[in-house]
């Protein structure tokens, strides 16, 4: 299941060269999401904090770098070898809105 969430906070993950920790508001709850953005973006905090994006939320929690990720950021381009971009709604929608 895909839902829109507001990226409220972006933080570095100690001991990881790739991961950032996102705090994401989904309307009914906040989730921690770990994403490998540090190697893709010069300043992930400035680029994505405060923006809405699409997340996969029906995955089992996954432990990475000693922390638990409760969803997965949906991005476009990584599989094709281009710098990934976020899947964003064209205008603001309620946090937690479902895609599809």
Question: Where are the model-predicted features located?
Answer:
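Phosphate-backbone binding interfaces of nucleic-acid-interacting proteins
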Residues: 1-100
